Amino acid sequence: LTFDDGPSENTDKVLKILKKYDAKATFFVTGNNQKYNDSIRKAEKQGNTIALHTYTHDYATVYSSTEAYFNDLQQISDMVKQITGKAPKYIRFPGGSSNMVSANYSQGIMSKLDSMVHERGYEYFDWNCSSGDAASNSVPAQTIVDNSTNCNYDQIMLLFHDSSPKTSTVEALPAIIENYKSRGYVFKAISDDTPIFHHGVNN
């Protein structure tokens, strides 16, 4: 389970559900909603992994140049380190490594970032199963359940969002966890042992 774009008021709700089911997740956080930063601390204390999305999540900013990307990444890294005492080394690119948006701002930047993040000691994670909750802010909970439980891989990296509008994601989460648990899956946070999920890079 991975959650992008938090923290928000929904993050604590997600954490309660994870705790109830003894499930762990990874939160790719931003700096856009810092009044909920205590949720980052709680998530980490609960045994989840805190990872970096970007500080602004503004495509025009982060994908304008490699320098702009790493300046933004440093900001979110510093913020998380201030909260948890740790500088995360796991990241997720806004839109994923296969995003079709970055080329509007800097042609070829994703290929450059692909190698540069590794040179700087980071690892990035995409996903191989999507909840579809990014399609709009009003995706019905049942649609999210259906999308999320439609994957049968041995190792699943499932994409959710825990930003403010994603209330139906929270609503859908218990049924998704129950479905996978009934099929014998275990929910782990990303660690150095986690299989790496990369999309094909688009530029």
Regions found by a protein language model. Give the residues of each.
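Terminal accessory/targeting
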Residues: L1, D12, K16-A25, N128, ...
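Active-site beta->alpha N-cap acidic-glycine motif
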Residues: L1-A87, N179, V186, P195-I196
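A cross-domain feature marking catalytic cores of carbohydrate-active enzymes
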Residues: F3-D5, V29-G31, L52-T54, R92-G95, ...
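Residue-level marker of alpha-helix boundaries and capping positions
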Residues: D5, T30, N104-Y105, T167
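Short aromatic-enriched loop/helix-cap "lid" or pocket-rim segments at secondary-structure transitions
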Residues: S39-I40, S102-S106, E171, H198-N202
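Alpha-helical scaffold elements lining the catalytic groove of polysaccharide deacetylases
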Residues: D58-K86, S97-Q155, S168-E171
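Acidic helix-start/capping segments at beta-turn-to-alpha-helix junctions
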Residues: R92-S98, I196-F197
